[in-house]
Amino acid sequence: DFFKDSFDVVYIASPNSLHFSQAKIALSAGKHVILEKPAVTQPQEWQELVQTAKDNKCFIFEAARNYHEDAFATIKDFLADKQILGADFNYAKYSSKMPNLLAGDTPNVFSDRFAGGALMDLGIYTLYAAVRLFGKPTHATYQAQKLDNSIDLNGDGILSYPNYQVHIKAGKNITSNLPCEIYTTDGTLTLDTIEHVSSAIFTDHQGNEVQLPIQQAPHTMTEEVAAFANMIKQADRTL
């Protein structure tokens, strides 16, 4: 009965492992779907959802909001004429659910049943930033501190590109106060964060600084919602 209503779009923010089945039901009912990141837990699930969306003339989106921020377009344009030497991206924040975990409970975000963990929750921001700015890596590795159920509490990854590497850190049992950095032959670009950039400063090898014109949206979801709405309106399936 829910999907018989006249709304156009459904936003699914249930535990990760439930995304696939719920999204398929919504798409089959002719509804556009926005899935909270990570959209699915297996690549083949995404492929099936994309096909279901096409079959029902619907759109499916992953709400990886930093990918759509205007800040990343500004950063990408700034880096266009520079030779990249590497980057360090991190997002680690002590989870509000850690006390529950330490008390012996297993919150959804730390559950293998629900495909939780640091990389799935916070690390995805670092991955999307890397793909947005540098493209798809040729190889990726991830080493993690894990619970007995195999879910990662924190970890470090390496994304390999032909001429450089991007190091990522994700954590839910630690907090990192470090900025993120992109290294070039001309100097270093420092970002205050990777998930909602408000400051980007380039420092050359002589110590001269250039502040990039970052205009942060008033709400963290403003830019991704605008992007999704425009794609639906224009029937544009390209990113």
For each of these PLM feature ranges, what is it?
Residues D1-T52:
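Beta-loop-alpha module in the N-terminal Rossmann-like domain of NAD(P)-dependent dehydrogenases
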Residues H19, W46, F72, T126-L127, ...:
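A general structural signal for well-ordered alpha-helical segments in protein cores
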Residues L35-E36, I60-E62, L191:
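Hydrophobic residues in well-ordered beta-strands that form the structural core
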Residues K37-P38, A63-N66, Y91:
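Short strand-turn motif at the edge of the Rossmann-like AdoMet-binding core
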Residues E69-T138:
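Predominantly a Rossmann-like dinucleotide-binding segment in NAD(P)-dependent oxidoreductases
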Residues T126-V197, V225-A235:
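Contiguous beta-strand/loop segments that form the cofactor/metal-binding neighborhood of enzyme cores
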Residues N208-L239:
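C-terminal helical cap and adjacent loop that interface with cofactors, partners, or active-site loops
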